Amino acid sequence: MVNPLYQKHIISINDLSREELEMVLTSAAALKARPQPELLKHKVIASCFFEASTRTRLSFETAIHRLGASVVGFPDADNTSLGKKGETLADTISVISTYVDAIVMRHSQEGAARLATEFSGQVPILNAGDGANQHPTQTLLDLFTIQETQGRLDHISVAMVGDLKYGRTVHSLTQALAKFDGNRFYFIAPKALAMPAHILHMLEEKGIAYSLHASIEDVIPELDILYMTRVQKERLDPSEYANVKAQFVLHAGDLLQARANLKVLHPLPRVDEIAIEVDHTPYAYYFQQAGNGIFARQALLAAVLGHNPDQPTS
């Protein structure tokens, strides 16, 4: 079978068709069931985090190590030539691409990952987040988790809560779920942080049902997935942050009318938007969701480097 993702840049979730998403998710399930510690033996992968991260960087680097590859890179831009000496992103990527087989990259500027593809030659770029734009590997682990908990990716009722304006995870996840059939969206956010118009327009063009709401309680009984997000302090001015940070908080009591199959997800880090008491309910699944990032990222790395987890390595 031809691997359509071999040496492909993964910048946006829109770079992947439904069939390609399903291929990656199948591989992720295979890797979760049966680890392959030598699948990427002798490969070297750069972990280039021009913007600091905890979970995404550690998840990627764990995925790399558990596939037998080596990882080089940096956790932030402060001590790089780009940060200290004014080197351009183009030059940085041009040089790093001569050292490695793939580049995992996070950057604070929207479009930076796409720009990097112009200078990496045949070395694939995997976007680990570019500003408020896209976070495709978070979306892959979200899809994997939804499929794991619901047994499907079609006909899902999902609510997204909190910062829907700047939250790149909800943009990517909405676009991904729109590739599947019969999904229904509920968007719950303050007006200042509403889902961007271009996402709503995309849903309208596809004939996908969505609605806007002012409270979580209104929609709980309808949901399969409740996707919480934090208000991103780093992307708001202090006065705006203070006004909206406490508007949408999930408590255990809000889940009394929930379906038995409901799972609460969150891309993390959590601040105050999910009360600690929710952790002890059967609905909480955000820590397992984070753990699934290793398998989703392993599957994507294997695909872009031309390896099939379902077949033994030579």
Swiss-Prot record:
L-aspartate binds at residues 85, 168, 230. Pfam families: OTCace, OTCace_N. It comes from the Bacteria. One of its GO terms (biological process) is 'de novo' UMP biosynthetic process. Its EC number is 2.1.3.2. The keyword Cytoplasm does not apply. It catalyses: carbamoyl phosphate + L-aspartate = N-carbamoyl-L-aspartate + phosphate + H(+). Coiled coil: none annotated. It is an enzyme of class 2 (transferase). The lineage of its organism: Bacteria, Pseudomonadati, Pseudomonadota, Gammaproteobacteria, Enterobacterales. Carbamoyl phosphate binds at residues 55-56, 106, 135, 138, 268-269. One of its GO terms (molecular function) is amino acid binding. One of its GO terms (cellular component) is cytosol. Belongs to the aspartate/ornithine carbamoyltransferase superfamily. ATCase family. Catalyzes the condensation of carbamoyl phosphate and aspartate to form carbamoyl aspartate and inorganic phosphate, the committed step in the de novo pyrimidine nucleotide biosynthesis pathway. It comes from Sodalis glossinidius (strain morsitans). Heterododecamer (2C3:3R2) of six catalytic PyrB chains organized as two trimers (C3), and six regulatory PyrI chains organized as three dimers (R2). This is Aspartate carbamoyltransferase catalytic subunit. Disulfide bonds: none annotated. Transmembrane segments: none annotated. Keywords: Pyrimidine biosynthesis, Transferase. Pathway: Pyrimidine metabolism; UMP biosynthesis via de novo pathway; (S)-dihydroorotate from bicarbonate: step 2/3.
